[in-house]
Regions:
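N-terminal low-complexity, acidic/polar interaction/targeting segments
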Residues: 1-236
Length: 236
């Protein structure tokens, strides 16, 4: 059951923000500078805004049609204003939403009406445990393969170099955290974001990381974002 519709400022990006993941932003466009100012001054309460991924072949300026339906809120953690008026932001993904409609006339930036997108209920910790174990194993294989390709040697990646951020994460949120430090295609990350079944989500991330580990090992290749979005931090 979805919640009531709420209003959220929207920041279209060429990436998918996942709950619990960190997202640094370098803000230089005037409209998003204004969004940052509105967040910092409290004009927009809660210091949160929505991040929506731009569809392949579309532009951030294409409005509602150019965005995926499901996005994630970003919580503003740190703000550094640069002398020329630009901003460096540190944000963290929080809550998933589904776009209802988008207003491009009220503010310099997009403002969206959204419905919150909760997880399905029913899976117990016991149900999820084997899927979580398999996902963690796939994540370690991916990280070990990446470590070897970067000159780390032929053995297992040392335990003290493994990202332990997900050690105490509950299984329903685990897939998002594991995906946070892997270079996965935008389509994979978007599918992961849209999936509301924790068990299916763990299976999705396991398959994605297994495939990417093979590509790393055999082709020494990883997915790279489109050049149109390859700018400092994330585009705006």
């Amino acid at each position: 059951m979805v919640d009531v519709v709420e209003t959220l400022p929207l920041f279209p990006l060429g990436t998918v923000l996942l709950p619990g993941a960190s997202l640094p932003l370098h803000v230089f466009e005037p409209r998003y500078r204004q969004l940052t100012i509105d967040l910092v001054t409290g004009t927009i309460p809660g210091k949160q805004f929505g991040v929506g991924a731009v569809r392949e072949g579309w532009s951030p300026d294409d409005g509602r049609e150019g965005l995926h339906d499901v996005g994630c809120t970003a919580s503003l953690r740190e703000v550094r204003r640069l002398p020329d008026g630009r901003f460096d932001l540190q944000t963290t993904g929080d809550r998933r939403f589904r776009l209802v409609d988008v207003d491009d006339s009220t503010a310099p930036y997009l403002v969206a009406n959204v419905e919150w997108l909760p997880d399905d209920e029913g899976d117990t910790p016991t149900d999820l445990a084997p899927f979580a174990m398999a996902a963690r194993a796939a994540h370690r294989r991916y990280c070990t393969t990446a470590w070897r390709q970067q000159g780390g040697g032929d053995g297992e990646m040392p335990a003290d170099l493994t990202d332990e951020a997900a050690t105490d994460v509950a299984d329903p949120e685990l897939a998002h955290i594991l995906a946070g430090d892997c270079l996965l295609p935008l389509s994979d990350r978007q599918e992961l974001l849209e999936e509301t079944c924790p068990m299916q989500r763990l299976q999705l991330i396991r398959r994605s990381m297994t495939r990417e580990a093979v590509l790393l090992a055999e082709l020494r290749a990883v997915w790279a974002p489109s050049a149109k979005f390859a700018v400092e931090h994330s585009p705006n």
